[in-house]
Amino acid sequence: MTLHEPLGLIDAARELRGFQAEPAQMRAGAPGKVGRLRLGFSLRDGRSVLHDLYRAAPLLVQQALYWDEAMPELPVCPIISVGGGILQGDRYTIDIAVGEGACAHVSTQGANRIHCMDANYASQHQTVTVAAGGYLEYLPDFTIPYRGSRFLSRTDLVVAADATLLYGEMVLAGRKHHHVEERFGFDLLSMDVNLRRPGGHKLVAEKILIEKGDPTIAFAAVMRGFDAFANILCVTPPETAARIKERFEPHFPIEAPRALSGVSRLPNAAGLMLRAVGVETYDVRHEVRRFWRIVREEARDRSLPAEPYWR
């Protein structure tokens, strides 16, 4: 199977030079190891619908659901991984497009597990496009890189000036309750995000790169005492961003903090960034939901329902 062009470009990333050996079980990018997903949402007869759906295992979306009681017009699409996690040699592409005036929520059925590896790596390329007046919440669950894993994710965001995108990356530093060497025991975690306007004007570029043995993760201002973190981008018009920032209260308890969080402005008046760290995933998730609720209220005048019991 021919690789999606951006996936082919990922192979040349500097941090992947030491992980080019082919897996013994099945070569990298072989049929069955290239997952593809394309979702297109549009406004039809006053209702946002999933009008375009293409999927190739192990990525799967069945249909749009309308189960958000606080925002019943919102189509919700959970991404299902039928493979039970990401393996060495896997290559994923995800393309999400929200048309003019439409809205959508895309999430995952559970954590994104990056399994142990002894050869090669896994990679993912995402393209997210939100047209004029559109609204998208793309909030995948936590990524959990197992000991010895290598994962690179590249995300391109294309957002119109009057649209709103809430995009999140949340990470747990390994199976912390499984083995003492699991915490930051992965070989490589590389995640970069590039944001631009439909005309091509570049607004924001950010990259998180954690390689095995990196001493900076233990710094007091980084991850000392914490095992989970989240970076949540809110790309929205400046006036909406100002209202959100005014309402969100940073969380910096002095004694025995379970979580820390704060919001900063993105360059080029592109919106806001929430950064949160926590002891457990639910500590970070709580901070993300605080921010998410305010974003939805200010951007769409809708509330956020109570978190499901299964969470």
UniProtKB/Swiss-Prot annotation:
Pfam family, one: UreD
Single GO MF descriptor: nickel cation binding
Keyword Cytoplasm attributed: yes
Main location: cytoplasm
Compartment(s) where it occurs, according to its Swiss-Prot or TrEMBL record: Cytoplasm
Keywords: Chaperone, Cytoplasm, Nickel insertion
GO cellular component, one term: cytoplasm
PANTHER family given in the database record: UREASE ACCESSORY PROTEIN D
Assembly notes: UreD, UreF and UreG form a complex that acts as a GTP-hydrolysis-dependent molecular chaperone, activating the urease apoprotein by helping to assemble the nickel containing metallocenter of UreC. The UreE protein probably delivers the nickel.
Function noted in UniProt: Required for maturation of urease via the functional incorporation of the urease nickel metallocenter.
Family that this chain belongs to: Belongs to the UreD family.
Protein name as annotated: Urease accessory protein UreD 2
Gene designation per UniProt: ureD2
